[in-house]
Structure formats: C-alpha cells, structure tokens
C-alpha cells in the first residue's frame, strides 16, 4: 500500500503524494484554473493531469529529481542548470497567455505592496531597519518597464525536474501568466547565485544582473512575513533572510 506523504500544507492549499500521484487541494479554484490552462499551453514538459474534482487536482509524478531546494544543497551539473535555462527561455518565447500572472504585477501595485511590507517588517520587529532599507534600495532596479513574456510566476528551484542533463518537467503553474521574464530567472536562482552564470548560458541572451539581484531582494522582502505566519522558516541558512543579508 502506498503511503500518503504531505509535500506542503498551509491554510491556503496543500499537496499530497500517494505513490506516483500528486493531489493538489486548493480552496481557490481560480488558481487551479490557471494551473491547468498554463500546463496545456506551456511549450515545456509539465505533469499529466489525471483528473480534477474540485477542490482537488490530481497530476502524475514527473521522472527525475529537482536541482535542489532553497536553503539546501544544489545538485546537477552545469549542463543541467544550462538546460533549465534553455527551457525557461523556450517558455518565455512562447505565445502569451491571456491573463497576467504573479510576475506581471504593475509597478504601481508592487511599489505599494513593497512599501507596506517594509514598514510592517520593521515596526513588527521581524527584520532590522538597516537590512530592510538596503534591500528596498536594491529592489528599486526591478521596478522598471518590461516586455511581457509567458512566465511561470513561481519558478522555485524545487519546481524544475531534471534527469541527468535533461529537463523532464516543471510543476506548480498556479501563478503563471504574462509577466517579467527576469522575475522567473531570479526566482529560479534565488539562494543559488553560484549557478546563475550556467542558467544564463542556457537562456541564451544577456540579462541585466542588477535586475536579477533586485528581484532577489524584492521577492524576499515580500514573502518573509508570510512564510513566518504560515509555519515556514525564512531565517534558515541559505533562505530568504540570508539572501537579504547578502545584499548588504
């Protein structure tokens, strides 16, 4: 009998694994709608949708392993990281989906969210003021006009699977949509700066490294408090707070 394994669980959604099947439970069916549509449109390998019965989506497990995790050791050869970069470029060059995604928030919305979050981080004593101020300055470089691309929107390292030097699939598409391509590249390399050059080689075009670093700061500032409130530890070695400290 297959065991039921909890992959991730918090108040908004949960993912369970039973054998070779992942069960995604999400009370917000709009997120599942986005995920199913994005997987059908993406020109890269994605999990097979087995069935859907709200609030549950069942997808097949992917072959291979991830390149690592935030705060954990990174695995895979430089060629594997480059292959991931090439897959990301293929996604970004695809025809645009119909709606904006997490990577497509407007500059006005981002500035408002970022300023509010920075104030809360300091007034609630979550992070020291100098750390927040410095990273808010670094984040400014991400707040610029960009050309819309087909973006994943939550392209964490743990969401990309490889077998050897081949990408076997990308999972968790609920934040996909039109957005800033460099947001995806920054999310994928967050906490693993040592592999950024390999990813860019595979991506096949020059990118603005100041904007990548800005997204590292911006994304980390926006998620620290949420992570704490939902039972995760952004203060763990190599995680979001260490990313912020690296910008000092």
Per-region residue spans from a language model:
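An alpha-helical support segment within catalytic cores of ATP-dependent transferases
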Residues: 1, 63, 93-153, 204, ...
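Alpha-helix C-terminal capping segments
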Residues: 1, 14-19, 38-43, 49, ...
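Helix-rich C-terminal or lid/interface subdomains of diverse kinases
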Residues: 12-13, 178-181, 186-248
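Active-site acidic catalytic loop and adjacent metal/ATP-binding pocket
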Residues: 12-17, 23, 49, 136-185
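Short, flexible helix/strand-to-coil boundary loops that buttress conserved ligand/catalytic motifs
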Residues: 42-43, 62, 70-71, 171, ...
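Conserved protein kinase catalytic core
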Residues: 30, 66, 160, 178, ...
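ATP-binding pocket architecture of kinase catalytic cores
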Residues: 4-105
């Amino acid at each position: 009998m297959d065991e039921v394994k909890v992959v991730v669980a918090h108040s908004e959604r949960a993912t369970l694994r039973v054998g070779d099947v992942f069960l995604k439970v999400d009370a917000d069916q709009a997120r599942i709608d986005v995920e199913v549509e994005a997987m059908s449109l993406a020109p890269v390998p994605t999990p097979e949708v087995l069935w859907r019965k709200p609030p549950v989506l069942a997808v097949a497990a992917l072959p291979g392993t991830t390149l690592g995790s935030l705060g954990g050791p990174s695995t895979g050869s430089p060629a594997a990281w480059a292959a991931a970069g090439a897959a990301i470029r293929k996604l970004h060059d695809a025809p645009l989906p119909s709606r904006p995604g997490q990577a497509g928030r407007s500059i006005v919305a981002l500035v408002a969210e970022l300023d509010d979050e920075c104030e809360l981080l300091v007034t609630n004593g979550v992070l020291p003021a100098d750390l927040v101020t410095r990273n808010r300055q670094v984040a400014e470089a991400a707040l610029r006009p960009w050309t819309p691309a087909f973006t994943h929107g939550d392209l964490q390292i743990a969401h990309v699977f490889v077998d050897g030097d081949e990408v076997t699939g990308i999972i968790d598409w609920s934040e996909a949509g039109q957005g800033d391509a460099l947001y995806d590249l920054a999310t994928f390399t967050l906490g693993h700066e040592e592999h950024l050059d390999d990813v860019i080689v595979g991506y096949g075009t020059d990118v603005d490294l100041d904007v990548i670093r800005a997204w590292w700061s911006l994304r980390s500032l926006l998620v620290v408090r949420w992570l704490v409130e939902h039972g995760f530890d952004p203060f763990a070695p190599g995680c979001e707070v260490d990313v912020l400290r690296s910008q000092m």
